[in-house]
């Protein structure tokens, strides 16, 4: 509990109890908020640490980016055997019905396959084909999955798909995108694309020009440089920003780029894709084209060795997320992915004009969550996501590597791990039952992991094969674990309630109930979210409310 005296403990206990007692009356929020903040600061003060806050075993090895759920999709070997969950039936662990175990068979049926489960590749390509709008979802007539909702989703993801090389899936180095040339004399657009660098562009040719002209900007100190970079990053579009030291542990052991081949589309244009879309749509099965693999050689591909990483967070829309698992919730995720590329590119240009090398990245190149933890932006939660103090897990992370030496931030602890031990709402809300129900995180061993997990770090198990299987069935990404999270809410005072509750025994059992008493989140049970009409009502509210609810 830390160094607190008896009087302060009693004060905090009474304040925490008072918060619980009045939790059904929203009129008192303004009164309770400062009291709860005081209690939280006494009982669960925010702390900083110089070391990485989670255990990393000596056996830890860097993660191969081609192992993650989405990149693994394009390995032809993954199309030879049925998708494999870590636990075939989790009901023996949770004591509840396993709502995810039948997904591989359901997805196979959607593809016209009889008598066997879908492969990993078939599962993921089913998702991608629906996500790109090339195939209707099975819910396309339902509120939240209509043509209107899908059109918004397409617009939100457009920059990520068209100008970022779909680095949301991972990969590196940088991004390559197909664009259609235009004849400036006739204004005719070609039907055959050419491959060019995307917004995650590692071309640092301008840096040497700045240096040769003696124009490299000199900062008075690492601290000043960090202050300036943070200010610039916020102006250029980030909602939160921190500085992490370059840590080789988080750089992927293998970089890779999906091999794209020309596919003739119904409109007559050629589109480069990493799978044969026309063949799939004509009933010919799923065929993928593999990867081009790269050694993680910074000097070869970016021209420098990183010293610092600028890590930033983009908030996702609260109203859109609470419609999960509808397509509207996917739209705010897509907007963030599109903005990640734009903001990272602008930060990289800023650094290059100052005479410093930069490599803008999304999910590619290295693991974002531990870098964000090192940058002081949040803690790692039960659902495997970064939990920030302001937005909870309702955000996306991007980063820019640079050779500019910056003063790093320190990891911060504000009660997330303690709360996640008690809450388990994200695990209960997962339609695929992909998130561990175990109380405590642990250093995962190989036998604890499914194929896309990296062992020997301290965390809760998350089965991406189950998660991705529901995405395929749903026809859209799912954000249930974000929507129900108590740290997701737009009013930060209930985050303080959560911090207090984890430290006071009498309140621990009610830790996950506080935001529910105020009507946040909606049903936790994934079936009830849909069957009760909650998701449909949230979609209607989203379209009927012209103003976004902001933090």
Swiss-Prot record:
Domain of life: Bacteria
Stored InterPro entries: 4Fe4S_Fe-S-bd, 4Fe4S_Fe_S_CS, RDH, TAT_signal, TAT_signal_bac_arc
Cofactor binding note from Swiss-Prot or TrEMBL: Binds 2 [4Fe-4S] clusters.
Entry's family note: Belongs to the PceA family.
Domain (4Fe-4S ferredoxin-type) ranges: 411-440, 478-496
Reactions this protein catalyses: trichloroethene + chloride + A + H(+) = tetrachloroethene + AH2; trichloroethene + AH2 = (Z)-1,2-dichloroethene + chloride + A + H(+)
Function recorded in the entry: Catalyzes the reductive dechlorination of tetrachloroethene (PCE) to trichloroethene (TCE) and of trichloroethene to cis-1,2-dichloroethene (DCE). Reduced methyl viologen can act as the artificial electron donor.
EC number(s) given by UniProt: 1.21.99.5
Cofactors, names only: [4Fe-4S] cluster; corrinoid
Protein name from the UniProt record: Tetrachloroethene reductive dehalogenase
Temperature behavior of the protein's activity: Optimum temperature is 50 degrees Celsius.
